[in-house]
Amino acid sequence: LNDRFGEILYGMPIIEDAEVAYKETRMVELVGIKKILDKYRDLVLQVRVGGTDFSSVFGVRRGVDYSIYDIMTVRECLSDIINICGRDNDYVISGPVWEYFRAPKELMFEELPHHGIEDYLMKRLPIVNNEIDGLLREVIQDKANGFVGRTVIHPSHVKFVNALMAVTKEEYDDACQILGTGGGVVKGAGGNKMNEIKPHTNWAKKVYNRARAFSVIENEGAFVKLFAVNE
């Protein structure tokens, strides 16, 4: 189409078919998909994943109090997709849809402690409401596993997903330090971690690019300010 019409059309393919869900065909299917993606790499904006479709294959559905990562069969699918398509930051892979929504009326807190939102969510302390808090917990797990952004099915989800994609200043400073250092090991910007240049380079590139797209915030306590439920 690009050659025929002289336009540049970009793609966001979605991986969600049963051949990927089934363990015995998954690797062959994913390697084949990766070969096709590589032919058009400059035109692939993002690779999406179908958590709901994978769940359907096995007749399961996560509840509002569970994460897609709690569904063992689906977790394996997502893990292998990241393994094949996410090596060396080959492609941006977004997290799956969260299917629960309820319009937020107000936040439980105006500001969280500096140590942050993950502590609240993983201890199941309320922040917005049950449906949105479940989404937030899953986005935190997305980031930990290498997903960037996610497909959303309801407008109320957008600001929460985008907010949690923002990078804290400490993460950003660490990423810049790693990318600006020739090698070896250095103390992290917060004085609380080791930054090993070579092993952490891919992480630093991903964080730096995420910061360019979603901005940098002072600390985890500032995530709540980005939720802006009344706007």
PLM region spans:
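Expand to "…catalyze enediolate/carbanion chemistry for C-C bond making/breaking, isomerization
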Residues: 1-231
